Amino acid sequence: MNSNTHAKSSNFHQSELDKFAALANRWWDADGPQKPLHALNPVRLEYVSARLEPAGARVLDVGCGGGLLSESMARLGAQVTAIDLAPELVKVARLHSLESGVQVDYRVQSVEDLAAEQAGSFDAVTCMEMLEHVPDPTAIIRACASLLKPGGKLFLSTLNRTPAAFALAVVGAEYIARLLPKGTHHYKDFIKPAELAAWLRNAGLQLEDVSGMLYEPWRNRARLSSRTEVNYLAYAVKP
């Protein structure tokens, strides 16, 4: 199935969808191509849970992939809707949900289309490791802001555009250690925190925090850090 079969939005690179769709069958393999993502997921969940009471919260996971974060939040009691434009990934996410018994409402849908249908519906929106893979990340942020209730919270993670990020996330992870498939990242699409802060302000959101996320490949572990040169998380609130 072509990855854009159900996609109305044009805010995606077909090559990016195809690249991640090809990893679908091993998405939940902790030792597979998404091994670093499995290491990052507990840290992402820790960051969100420290700022949001998950139990009973309506949460949207944008760019959910195979559902790692979606299921994790649902296990904590959140009512999770999760969207992705790759049908192959959503299929894997749904199958894993059936196996685990964790309920998540998975959809093949763009965040822009969902915003047109359900503005102001969610207590929190998460958008992790996605902004650097789309043509117009500002449109994603605007749609996320629209979907939040007043007082709602947006959680983001992405890669900083620094020499350190190029050395570690591209050269090191993809070509030397081979932790990720070659071509996973494009350095020119990485996002500086100051750029992200401006996009959030323009979307009417208040940036509350930026924290580094440090991945230690020799231990296959990740942790929060004050250093934002490579991976970082951000948290913003809708007034």
Curated annotation (Swiss-Prot):
Keywords: Methyltransferase, S-adenosyl-L-methionine, Transferase, Ubiquinone biosynthesis. Pfam families: Methyltransf_23. GO terms for molecular function: 2-polyprenyl-6-hydroxyphenol methylase activity; 3-demethylubiquinol 3-O-methyltransferase activity; polyprenyldihydroxybenzoate methyltransferase activity. The keyword Methyltransferase applies. S-adenosyl-L-methionine binds at R44, G63, D84, M128. It is an enzyme of class 2 (transferase). It catalyses: a 3-demethylubiquinol + S-adenosyl-L-methionine = a ubiquinol + S-adenosyl-L-homocysteine + H(+); a 3-(all-trans-polyprenyl)benzene-1,2-diol + S-adenosyl-L-methionine = a 2-methoxy-6-(all-trans-polyprenyl)phenol + S-adenosyl-L-homocysteine + H(+). This is Ubiquinone biosynthesis O-methyltransferase. It comes from Xanthomonas axonopodis pv. citri (strain 306). The gene is ubiG.
